[in-house]
């Protein structure tokens, strides 16, 4: 293996949602944890079904399966805790997965203009072509209506 080829290889975590596999850059993964109690409460954030408590943090649970496969998950094997970026800030988000996760090294092909915004690129692994997910586009953020609502709430809360 040449030095130039080694530089192009990146680490990815393969995750299973139903029958399909997806990939996330390993740099975005904090940990993989067993399912725990999801605390549900009234809120206005779409795609967030509740929160879990992990290592002293409140971590939002975001089931992205419906956006990716067209079906909501009925069972969960693990939560993949990923790092979501909001501008200059970061936050953990828990993604429910239905099967084992796998760490692989591979060369990612960049997404094209015709690809959906949640696709960061593509991997070829074991004869399959796998979507590499752009979590910033797939999970809810502080942009648009949510950002305006949060800013309005922050201004109203000031003395």
Identify what each model region corresponds to.
Residues 1-159:
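An acidic, low-aromatic, low-complexity terminal/linker signal
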């Amino acid at each position: 293996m040449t030095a130039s080829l080694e530089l192009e290889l990146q680490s990815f975590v393969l995750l299973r949602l139903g029958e399909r596999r997806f990939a996330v850059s390993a740099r975005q993964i904090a940990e993989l944890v067993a399912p725990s109690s999801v605390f549900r409460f009234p809120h206005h954030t779409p795609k967030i079904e509740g929160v879990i408590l992990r290592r002293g943090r409140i971590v939002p649970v975001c089931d992205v399966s419906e956006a990716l496969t067209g079906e909501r998950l009925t069972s969960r094997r693990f939560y993949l805790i990923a790092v979501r970026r909001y501008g200059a800030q970061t936050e953990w988000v828990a993604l429910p997965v239905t099967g084992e996760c796998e760490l692989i090294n591979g060369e990612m092909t960049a997404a094209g203009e015709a690809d959906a915004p949640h696709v960061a690129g593509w991997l070829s692994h074991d004869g399959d072509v796998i979507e590499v997910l752009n979590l910033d586009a797939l999970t809810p953020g502080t942009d648009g209506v949510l950002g305006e609502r949060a800013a309005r709430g922050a201004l109203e809360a000031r003395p």
